[in-house]
From Swiss-Prot:
Pfam families: Ribosomal_L23. The keyword RNA-binding applies. GO terms for biological process: translation. Belongs to the universal ribosomal protein uL23 family. The keyword rRNA-binding applies. This is Large ribosomal subunit protein uL23. GO terms for cellular component: ribonucleoprotein complex; ribosome.
Length: 95
């Protein structure tokens, strides 16, 4: 699996911004079949940083209803990546 197939997108919320500033942790949506080692190698290769730890979790899709039609959002996987002290990823700076 290629690095750009593993890392889908960064997750940018108030909570993840606080984690980024205080704990040097970045949150990503990743491929569901990727493991921690794959995610670590992909982050290190794409962003040229060193990773200290990776936490992953499966997020269940919510059931949504629009009128009488009931559907479900897809399940996805989230990874919280802790960078080594002194390392940074600057893709949201200046926004």
């Amino acid at each position: 699996m290629r690095e750009y197939d593993i890392i889908r997108r960064p997750i940018n919320t108030e909570k993840t911004n606080l984690q980024k500033e205080t704990d040097n942790q970045i949150t990503f949506e990743v491929a569901r079949d990727a493991n921690r080692v794959d995610i670590k190698n992909a982050i290190e290769k794409i962003f040229n940083t060193r990773v200290q730890a990776v936490k992953t979790m499966q997020v269940k899709g919510k059931v949504k209803q629009r009128g009488r039609i009931v559907g479900k959002r897809r399940n996805w996987k989230k990874a919280i990546v802790k960078l080594m002290p002194g390392q940074r990823i600057d893709f949201f700076e200046g926004v």
